[in-house]
């Protein structure tokens, strides 16, 4: 990512030199402020390095590359199409990297802190949100795939206000089951809810408890936006032209 940032500002050699010389400073900032990203940034990945420290090492160069890449795209707008769309592909890559750091690197998918046990008709608080399990939904007929479906209807509240009703569940096949994910889309990212499929039998027998995994994924929109920008720009480059040099 540092190399990509340097390439983005290659027309300003002095800035490239300062950028490469600042690499030790980025490492120091990551070591001192790795915990400041929040979420699961304090979780240790190995060798005494936590998720936040690794995230900052990638995030700072990506943020530095963002304005430079936008500037290159603007300079080529309305000129030769291939360089313009090529810079848009690079812009999409930068956005994807930033979103990946925020929604994946600093989020630990395997920790028990994301497991929430809900009691029917009672609100349970988790990380500023409240979840209320209201009913179990079952379906065996009319399914496009699978032999049966079991879902839990859950109201999601923020600051005491209902923001959405979701239904994470389990899709059953003859030999195995598959969790069906539901999510709440917000301006900062997605709140993803996954039901633990091992409790399907107890819910079918009338249990008032449901166990879900909850992941608050900030910046996930940047992942999808960056991916879409890269795909559309690539298609635009491949489109036939009357003049192959355009």
Model-derived regions, located:
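Accessory, solvent-exposed terminal regions and/or long lumenal/extracellular loops of proteins
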Residues: 22-30, 94-245
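Contiguous transmembrane helix-bundle modules in multi-pass membrane proteins
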Residues: 1-124, 219-246
């Amino acid at each position: 990512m540092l190399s990509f940032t340097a390439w983005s500002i290659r027309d300003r050699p002095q800035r490239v030199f300062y950028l490469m010389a600042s690499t030790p400073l980025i490492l120091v900032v990551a070591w001192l402020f790795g915990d400041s990203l929040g979420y699961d940034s304090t979780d240790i990945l190995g060798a005494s390095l936590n998720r936040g420290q690794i995230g900052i090492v990638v995030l700072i160069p990506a943020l530095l590359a963002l304005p430079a890449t936008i500037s290159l795209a603007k300079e080529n707008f309305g000129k030769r199409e291939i360089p313009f769309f090529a810079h848009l592909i690079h812009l999409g890559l930068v956005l994807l990297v930033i979103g990946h750091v925020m929604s994946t690197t600093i989020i630990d998918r395997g920790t028990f802190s994301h497991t929430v046990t809900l009691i029917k008709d009672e609100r349970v608080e988790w990380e500023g949100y409240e979840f209320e399990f209201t009913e179990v939904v079952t379906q065996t007929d009319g399914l496009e795939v699978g032999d049966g479906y079991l879902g839990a209807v859950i109201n999601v509240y923020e600051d005491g206000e209902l923001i959405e009703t979701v239904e994470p569940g389990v899709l059953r096949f003859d030999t195995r089951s598959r969790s069906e994910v539901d999510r709440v889309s917000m301006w900062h990212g997605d709140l993803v809810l996954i039901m633990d499929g091992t409790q399907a039998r107890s819910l079918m027998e009338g249990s008032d408890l449901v166990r879900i995994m909850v992941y608050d994924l900030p910046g996930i929109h940047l992942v999808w936006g960056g991916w879409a920008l890269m795909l559309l720009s690539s298609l635009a480059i491949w489109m036939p032209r009357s003049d192959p040099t355009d």
